[in-house]
């Protein structure tokens, strides 16, 4: 209730959630559906296996998380690191959707790894969410923000399907 009865606090909370959405867009929609959707859509040369694509993405997530912490220490700013990672994610998504047609299966797995690296700012995302609020609601925000982000995958999927249907027809 304390999060929702103050407009400024609510929008701060909503912004914290929105920062984490690209992570699960990439992992929950793009990489998790590599074999069923993206391998055919991108005309991947070879057989893509979801488990392998997810493995490379999660290795990338781990690498990205380590480097996001190091970079935030060097830059002395978590916010700059999140913007840097979001920019890297945008570049990779543009490549993924518009320029990866006919990619080899090995190239696809490398791309999955890079997507993981680009979305490997989970620890910083949770830390930023926790630091935005005072002691009374910090625990609530720290626990619920990642849950809302993970829980958004069905909504992201429905929106993606809707937009795909609009652009294909």
PLM segments and residue spans:
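Hydrophobic core of transmembrane alpha-helices in multi-pass small-molecule transporters
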Residues: 105-120
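Cytoplasmic membrane-interface "Motif A"-like loop-to-helix N-cap segments
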Residues: 74-87
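Intracellular juxtamembrane helix-capping segments at the cytosolic ends
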Residues: 120-133
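Helix-to-loop junctions at the C-terminal end of transmembrane segments
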Residues: 64-77
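C-terminal ends and interior cores of transmembrane alpha-helices
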Residues: 87-102
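A late C-terminal transmembrane helix in Major Facilitator Superfamily
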Residues: 130-166
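Extracytoplasmic gate region of multi-pass secondary transporters
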Residues: 8-62, 153-157
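Interfacial helix-cap and linker-helix signal at transmembrane-aqueous boundaries
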Residues: 38-39, 71-72, 160-168
């Amino acid at each position: 209730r304390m999060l929702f009865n103050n407009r400024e606090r609510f929008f701060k909370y909503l912004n914290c959630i929105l920062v984490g959405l690209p992570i699960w867009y990439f992992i929950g929609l793009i990489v998790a559906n590599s074999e069923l959707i993206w391998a055919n859509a991108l005309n991947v040369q070879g057989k893509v296996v979801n488990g392998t694509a997810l493995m490379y993405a999660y290795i990338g997530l781990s690498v990205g998380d380590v480097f996001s912490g190091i970079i935030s220490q060097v830059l002395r700013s978590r916010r700059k690191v999140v913007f840097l990672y979001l920019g890297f994610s945008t570049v990779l998504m543009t490549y993924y959707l518009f320029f990866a047609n006919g990619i080899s299966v090995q190239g696809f797995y490398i791309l999955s790894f890079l997507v993981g690296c680009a979305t490997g700012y989970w620890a910083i995302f949770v830390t930023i969410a926790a630091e935005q609020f005072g002691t009374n609601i910090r625990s609530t925000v720290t626990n619920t923000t990642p849950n809302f982000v993970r829980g958004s995958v069905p909504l992201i999927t429905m929106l993606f399907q809707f937009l795909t249907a609009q652009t294909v027809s």
